[in-house]
Each structure stands twice: as structure tokens, then as C-alpha cells.
């Protein structure tokens, strides 16, 4: 079979708008993209390997330049043919939803993988391992999936005119956007529309997923993130609509928020994070909300879990906690709601359905900085920044580390150092490596497992740094004082 005929088969299989009668038409569409010389190009049974063959042929035929951006743009165009139109996708999704939410999400997830919108091969490169801690097994990932920028594309982008369209990577405007040297190709991207709080929202999957069925729920309007009572209402509405998914929001302040504060969105998916498994340590009373169970979660960060079968009462209780926290100051533990009139408090909320009940975890956040901690008082401190210095966002709050790609090679050099072998270990790891060398015996047989455990301990410390009420006696007494204010 040729690459062209194989891809025609993929298109007909995935896109109900085409049948085998369209084979000649589709063949000509493909030749227009990759060049007539590719007509007899030998194919591969694997659709993604077959895709690679066509992209390579297009480059050899002079249809695209030799750059990463050009290859990705063509990949998306070739897979766009295999993807139903946005209106058709939405019709099919909501038709399938009638048979059950899981039926619809399973179908949309499978399509988003099959059409290469979800970059399954890139995601497979990520390093993932568990790490035992006093808080349960944390999840450690070294993120290798996002491709490094091609120097040719960087140079081209520097000279390109800035259109400002799409406004950002989360906008509805990205659906079907061809892409350019400085903006990802999204021709094969599709978004499910739904109403949330009386407004149009979109539901899509993340192309570089950090966990199973990593979903993004986004406001149709490009407006900044905000955490208020409507946030809690929206999150509970989403888990009612998609009960097999959790959903949460990044905080709405710098340092403690995510990397995208300019567009209102939430993240969710079908994954049980370590924080969801963590038990309640201490029960808490929420004034005026007797039907809401509340408690402090055994977790390195400061988390209050609210549980109720009544979503309205849960929303009101969560808003009460948020409002008290947003005004709460305790100088004895460096917790300050305002400094010079500037607000520093917010929450990272996470919602789940557990049987007939709703769960809402509120993670207390404070984004102050100081001379001692210029990156953030409640942010990874300097001595752990050799492993993690970026913001602690929603996913990491829940116990899944998203560590930078540099660590794959850097930790390999640390291992060589610990084994007494020749190495090029970065100086920033030396203090930590010396502590590990003094404390443990290192052999070629145990070095990888012990290194993973050590990284897990550092990540637990990172989360403790981000916790506003520390796990020591002083911090826990301060947490109890805050809870009494509720």
C-alpha cells in the first residue's frame, strides 16, 4: 500500500463525512499538499509513521521548507482531513453524550489521539515514576514532550509581523488555525461547546497531556482568570456534567498561579491524584454551614476539604472560606492578606464527584515576596530550585511534579558523581549531591532507585515550601487559629 492510500483509509475511518467514494478526491487533496511525486510513495501500516513519510516527501518535493514549524503545520493539515468539522464534532459528541458522559468523552479522547492533536509520541518520552513520602506516593514527571524550538523558526519569528491573532493559545480562535513559526499549528484542533453559568465555554484536550485525559475547559471570551463564587459553581457544574473527571482551577495571582493568567480556564481529567487519596487529619466547623463536612487534609500544602451532597451549600461554604482567607493575616507565620494595599491571598480549588457527594478542596495560597525569598515566601526556596524553581500550579499542588527537561541529563551526571565516576555535574546540584553521598551507600544497582526517591523527597519539600501553614507545631497552631476564624 502507498502512503497516500493508507492515509485515505485513515481519513475515511476517522471522518464520517467521507466514504471510499471520495478516494480520488482525497488523493488529489493529499498530492496538493505533498507533491505529485509522492503518488507511489511506499506507506506504513501505522498511521503516524505513515504521516512522517508524507511530511518527509513534501520536504523533499519542495512543498515545505526544512523547519520544525513547517513540518508541524503540514502534519496538522494532513490530519485535519481525518477530523470532522467543528459543527459535526459537536453534534456527534452531544449525540453520544445521551448514552452517557463517559461514552462521549471516550470517543472525543480517542479521536484527539488518532488525529495526532494529542501528541502521543511526544508524551511517551516523558519520564514518570512514583516517590514514597509521608504524604503518600507522589508522582514525579520529567517533561520531555514539548519540542525545543528550531533555531530557524526562532530566527523567522523575530522578523515576522505580530498579528495578535489568535489572542492566546487557549482562545477559541485557535480552532483550525494553520499556525506559524511562533504559534502552534491547530488545523486539526476541535473544541466542544457547552453552556456554563449562562456563558459559552469550550472543552478540549491538552496536546501535551500531563496526565490521563488531560482536559482544558476554557471561556469563549479572552478574559483574565479570577477566583470567586462563580468559580466554585462552575467547577461543580463541570463535575456534574462529566462525573468521571475531576476539575480544578489555577490560582488567579502571579507566583502562586499557573503560566496562563490572561485567559479564564480550568483543567481536569480522568486521573486520581495523590492529594485526592490523602485523608482528613482534623475536622473543621464552617460557621453557618452545618450540612457541609469540612476538614484539614494531611498534605504538605494547606488544604481544607469540603464535602456535601448539596452543591449550593457547598458553593456557599467555599465562598465563605475564600472570603475569610482573603482578609486573613497572621504575622507570626508571615501570612499577610495585604501589603501596602495589594492583595496577596487566593485559593487553588479542585472539585470531584465521589458517589452522590461533591468534594471541593481549597488550597490556601499567599504570593508575598521578601528580601530572603525574592521568588516568593510560599514558593520553592533557593535550596530546592536546582530541581524546581517554576510556579507551583494546579497539577503540582495535587502531587504530580512537572519537572524541567534539563533534569534528565543533569540527574544522570549527579548519579555518576555519586558513584565516583567521571562526570560533568552542574555546580548547582553539588550541595544536594554531597548530602546524598554522605547519607547513603551508592552502587550501580541502587543508584537509579535511590535517585528517584531523593527527587521525590525534594518535591515534597517544594510543596511544603508552598504551604502557608507549615507542618511544624507553630504552623499547625496557626492553621488551627485560621480554622477557628471560619
UniProtKB/Swiss-Prot annotation:
Q: Which InterPro entries match?
A: GalP_uridyl_Trfase_II, GalP_uridyl_Trfase_II_CS, GalP_Utransf_C, GalP_Utransf_N
Give a GO biological-process term. Answer: galactose metabolic process
Q: Which UniProt keywords apply?
A: Carbohydrate metabolism, Cytoplasm, Galactose metabolism, Nucleotidyltransferase, Transferase
UniProt-listed Pfam families = GalP_UDP_tr_C, GalP_UDP_transf
- Give the molecular function GO annotations: UDP-glucose:hexose-1-phosphate uridylyltransferase activity
Q: Which domain of life is it from?
A: Bacteria
Reactions accelerated catalytically: alpha-D-galactose 1-phosphate + UDP-alpha-D-glucose = alpha-D-glucose 1-phosphate + UDP-alpha-D-galactose
Q: What class of enzyme is it?
A: transferase
Coiled-coil intervals: none
The record's subcellular location field reads: Cytoplasm
Q: Which GO terms describe its cellular component?
A: cytoplasm
- State the EC number(s): 2.7.7.12
Give the metabolic or biological pathway.
Carbohydrate metabolism; galactose metabolism
- The answer to keyword Cytoplasm applying to this record is yes
| Family membership noted in the UniProt record | Belongs to the galactose-1-phosphate uridylyltransferase type 2 family.
Name of the protein this chain belongs to? Galactose-1-phosphate uridylyltransferase
Gene, per the UniProt record: galT
